[in-house]
Design a protein with these regions (language model features):
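Short, surface-exposed "cap/lid" segments of acyl-processing enzymes
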Residues: 33-37, 41-64
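C-terminal catalytic histidine-bearing segment of alpha/beta-hydrolase fold enzymes
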Residues: 220-276
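Short beta-strand/loop motif that positions the catalytic acidic residue
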Residues: 205-207, 211
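Primarily recognizes the serine-hydrolase "nucleophile elbow" in alpha/beta-hydrolase
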Residues: 98-167
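Conserved alpha/beta-hydrolase "acid-adjacent" motif
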Residues: 212-221
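Mobile cap/lid helix-loop segments that gate and shape the active-site cleft of serine hydrolases
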Residues: 6-12, 162-195
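Catalytic nucleophile-loop/oxyanion-hole region of alpha/beta-hydrolase
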Residues: 53-62, 73-111
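N-terminal cap/lid segment of alpha/beta-hydrolase-fold proteins
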Residues: 1-35
Length: 276
């Protein structure tokens, strides 16, 4: 396929690329009109790190951000039940982000952001702190990540795995990590976002105060830890039904409006104008 045909394909309906041999090691790329290069948002879906939910749930947000002038990289990854868990899930998220320079598309790799919902929020903040690993743990590189993330956005996520393990009696966290923090402290040390603070970029947390799936306490605790350690984390709390767990992936909702407001704001490192 010629470069011109590829770009036309990306503009009209996007394309799916493989970043590894497994069928879950795929991602969809959408690029807005215009010469570019365009800022990039990496989307990471949730679903308790299990195989029952896939990247399709993020397509509404992808479509909205595409219209606002962003290139969108909506990733899939191996999850518990289809070859994922420790360390594969973490390795896949890192590999998907590091695959961006290999794409023949007008992407501005100096302006890459990451956004995740629920379990994807955990993975987004973990990916944002990969530069702190430096050769230790999945997804680490001795010279640092190939792609530098400029800002991280996490929606209703789990940012303290050890605390979630205790709160939920193991559950999804135990399935992801292969056990608890007392028996596997080395895994939690490199897989738990709370242990990797402060991130080197600004973080936006959005969470509903009445979320019955993932308590807002996780966002509050993470924000306190980041800011206390010299980092920058902002928390937007959504009250009432507008802050339910799944409302975050509705592009018409208040939770998503908080994200797009941040992306337009002066504090954001990237603020493209909406595409008419």
């Amino acid at each position: 396929m010629t470069r011109g045909r590829l770009l036309l394909d990306l503009l009209t309906r996007g394309r799916t690329f493989s970043y590894g041999p497994d069928r879950s090691q795929r991602a969809d790329l959408r690029v807005p009109p215009g010469e570019g290069p365009h800022p990039v948002m990496v989307f990471i879906h949730g679903g308790s790190w299990r195989s029952g939910q896939g990247r399709i749930v993020m397509r509404g947000l992808v479509g909205d951000l595409l219209r606002r002038g962003w290139s969108c990289w909506n990733i899939e990854y191996r999850r518990v039940g289809n070859g994922g868990g420790w360390p594969a899930t973490f390795e896949d998220v890192a590999a998907a982000i590091d695959h961006l320079p290999r794409l023949d598309a007008p992407l501005d790799l100096s302006r890459v952001s990451v956004l995740g919902h629920s379990a994807g929020g955990h993975l987004a903040l973990w990916a944002a702190c990969r530069d702190r690993l430096r050769g230790g743990g999945p997804g680490s590189e001795r010279e640092g990540p190939r792609v530098r993330i400029r800002q991280a956005i996490a929606q209703a996520g789990v940012y303290e795995l050890a605390g979630a393990y205790r709160l939920w009696g193991g559950g999804a966290v135990a399935a992801l990590m292969g056990g608890g923090p007392e028996e596997l402290p080395e895994r939690y040390a490199v897989g738990d976002p709370l242990g990797l603070v402060p991130p080197s970029m600004p973080v936006l947390l959005v969470h509903g105060t009445l979320d019955q799936t993932v308590s807002v306490r996780f966002s509050r605790g993470y924000q306190r830890a980041v800011n206390a350690s010299g980092g920058e984390a902002e928390l937007v709390e959504i009250d009432g039904p507008a802050g339910s767990h799944r409302s975050h992936i509705d592009p018409r909702g208040a939770a998503w409006a908080a994200v797009t407001t941040r992306l337009r704001g002066a504090r954001a490192p990237v603020a493209p104008e909406p595409v008419s």
